[in-house]
Amino acid sequence: MSRIYDLSVPIKTGGLVYPGNPEISVELQQAVAKGASANVSLIRFGSHTGTHADASRHFFDDGQPVDQIPLERLIGPAILIAFPDDVRSVTAENLKSRKLEGQKRVLIRTRNSALLSQQQFVPDYTFLAPDGAQYLVDIGVELVGVDYLSIEQFHSGHHKTHKTLLARSVVIVEGLNFSAPPPGQYQFICLPLRLEGCDGAPARAVLIA
């Protein structure tokens, strides 16, 4: 029997956000307990909240918006690789040792998965180095998933990792919690909200063993 791993971070009022992004608010606007016929909530958050997909439009005005990412890129075989806690920057050299040629979806587990449950943002999270991003582009990867709110070094000042990937329409999925699944081959499903013309969107993401 297949096992399904839910990789998604819960979206809740006051939940973890990247510094400068909108805060999360989930408020009950109509309540049965107060005489309404149904419960209806008002939800406020940014497009890069929790587990989410970055589209090319995140950094390029003429880039592909999130609603136009082909579903074929978001669903299919994926490899989950893991790095020890002392790896703080995932470089091309790190990735070359994993024999990723032929893989279309690469998911990178680091010490960050343990940080996702913390209420406070941790700025020294592990990130994908620009040369690592270029290596993944060079071998034909179409989707990269990471386990913190950004794939880029905090306050990098250049956004080279994002731009290297998104310029080639490589989908970036951030905020994936890889605490439960062991490294290996899986079926990956990531379905961002269909926000028309938007630069990114929260998503429900799972691995199926």
Question: What is each of the regions a protein language model found here?
Answer:
Residues 1-209:
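Active-/binding-site microenvironments in catalytic and ligand-binding cores
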